[in-house]
A protein has these predicted regions:
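Flexible coil/turn and secondary-structure edge motifs
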Residues: 1-160
Length: 160
């Protein structure tokens, strides 16, 4: 098993997206930290995955296509578009995936590839937000469209 981190807007959404993929064993929701100037805690998830089923580059592509990867984020902000990597191989694969995304969309991808430094878990009541009650208005409005996108564009990796 391997781990990789993602940040991109609300961690409830990010958690729900990765929980919907084959090969993802666990998603830990909370706040991630990198090196300066990205050392402020920001919402995100740590994804534990089986690389025999799903590669880090595919996880990064799913991430890029299910949040505002071309948006502007502040290093000090609570939200940031980022891939938090645990080694050089993940760094290179994430950078290639982001460059390909920018080429495919014709938009600048402002998603940063950052070294993982730290993680603080969310309060228990916020964990598994989508899975505990997918009928919540927030889930229906923001997470359901992302899951529909996964089922349409990553059908072979989408859980039923």
């Amino acid at each position: 098993m391997e781990k990789i981190g993602f940040g991109g807007g609300c961690h409830w959404c990010t958690e729900g997206v990765f929980q919907a993929l084959r090969g993802v064993v666990q998603v830990d929701q909370g706040f991630l930290q990198s090196e300066p100037p990205w050392d402020a805690w920001a919402e995100g998830v740590i994804v534990t995955f089986d690389p025999a089923i799903i590669q880090p580059g595919i996880l990064a592509e799913v991430h890029l296509r299910t949040h505002s990867a071309s948006g502007t984020y502040s290093p000090e902000g609570r939200y940031r578009s980022a891939v938090y990597v645990f080694d050089d191989e993940q760094h290179d694969e994430a950078a290639r995936t982001i460059a390909q995304f920018a080429s495919d969309t014709g938009e600048p991808a402002r998603t940063a590839v950052l070294a993982f430094v730290g993680f603080r878990g969310s309060e228990e009541r916020y964990r598994n937000y989508y899975q505990t009650d997918p009928s919540r208005p927030f889930c229906r409005r923001y997470i359901d469209p992302k899951l529909a996108y996964i089922r349409q564009h990553f059908a072979d990796l989408a859980l039923p």
